[in-house]
Structure formats: C-alpha cells, structure tokens
A protein has these predicted regions:
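Polar low-complexity intrinsically disordered regions
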Residues: 1, 75, 89, 196-205
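Soluble extramembrane regions of membrane proteins in the secretory/endomembrane system
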Residues: 1-54
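Context-gated lysine
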Residues: 33, 42-45, 52, 60, ...
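Core alpha-helical transmembrane segments of integral membrane proteins
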Residues: 49-119, 125
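Generic detector of multi-pass transmembrane helix bundles and their immediately adjacent loops
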Residues: 114-205
Length: 205
C-alpha cells in the first residue's frame, strides 16, 4: 500500500516506448534489439545473467489487508465523531493525532512532486493526505480546546470532495476512498458544529 500511495495519476496512463525504458528490463530488451551501422551490426554482442532471479518467501504477513485496515479506521473515526455530537464535545487530542498523521503523509507526497520519477510527481492523493494539516495543526487544536471550530475543516472538506472527483483521473491506493469517506464525515461534522455553536450559545443565554 505504501508504494501505491506514492504513485500519481500519470502511472495510470499508457506509456510510450521511451518512457518504458525507465524500467531496466525494457531498456535491456531495446539494447538487445538495437542495430548500429549500415551492415546490421548489433549494439549488444552478448547478454549474461549476473544474478539469477529467486523467489522471496514471506514467512509472516500482516493479517489485515489495506481495505480491512481502512474500514476499521474509518469505522473508528465515524463512531468517535458521532459520540462527539451526542455529547456536544470535541475530542481535540484525537484531532491532534489525526492531523499530525495526515500532515506527515502529505509532506511526503509533497516532496515527491519534486522527484524526477514521472509517476510520482502529480499525485491527487495529496488532497486527502494534505500537508496543510501540519501548518494548521496548532491553530486547530487551540480553537477546539475553546469549543470552537477552525476554518481548516471547511477547506479540508472541499479538498476531500475534489479527491473523490479525482477518481476519474487516478486509481487511488487500496482503501483510500473508504478512509476519505470517514474524513469527509468528520470534517463536515466540524463545519456543521461551527455553525451550530452560536445557536447553542444563544439558547444557553
């Protein structure tokens, strides 16, 4: 799953012959077929195998698939969000950990935009794993500790909508859409609670 997270939407489009040469095996085949000179002299005289391929046996795999992990995490986020609404509270410590995780992953994706690798530079998954979460982390927590919401959640809600639209252009990593749905619920609920705060304060007054 980690490798899939780094792949952008260009990984899903057909590649040209020159782009396929980025892979050593394809480059080797093209060199083997290459002819130099009018006499038909081949570029490669001989091909030898330095290290023979071998099968790597994984003795113990992680018991859950990426989809199963995404479902468990999404269920936890949604249930926690519903409990918040029921109690009229904000679990700011959970948001602290959540935004930290989102922001760190987003920072990694942002760095990949400067890579020379053609398939990792433009990755729409950065809309979900957003590096802006790191920038807004402390302001969000400060406001939530005072019982208020931050504008970040409204911006993040829009980013997740754009993430879903991005399915047209890119095949996301396994389980990402499930995770995005739970984060859409949480960010949307934060926006809704922000609108409800003045009403609740008036009722208490």
């Amino acid at each position: 799953m980690g490798n899939d997270l780094l792949l952008g939407f260009q990984a899903d489009r057909p590649t040209s012959v020159s782009e396929q040469q980025f892979l050593p095996y394809h480059l080797m085949e093209d060199f083997d077929k290459a002819v130099v000179g009018p006499d038909g002299h081949k570029l490669v005289k001989e091909t030898r195998t330095v290290i023979k391929p071998f099968t790597h046996v994984v003795e113990k795999e992680f018991p859950l698939s990426p989809t199963a992990c995404a479902i468990c995490l999404a269920a936890f986020i949604i249930i926690l969000t519903l409990v918040e609404c029921k109690l009229h509270k904000t679990f700011w410590l959970f948001d602290l950990l959540l935004l930290l995780l989102i922001g760190v992953c987003g920072a990694i994706l942002a760095v990949m935009w400067f890579s020379e690798h053609p398939t990792v530079r433009l990755n729409l998954q950065i809309l979900l794993l957003n590096p802006i979460a790191l920038i807004c982390l402390l302001p969000v927590v400060r406001r939530e500790r005072k019982g208020k919401s931050h504008w970040f959640w409204a911006v993040y809600f829009i980013c997740i909508i754009l993430f879903f639209i991005g399915n047209i252009l890119q095949n996301y990593a396994e389980g990402m859409n499930i995770l995005a749905l739970s984060l859409l619920v949480r960010s949307g609920m934060s926006v809704w609670k922000n609108k409800q705060t003045p009403v609740i304060q008036q009722q208490k007054a």
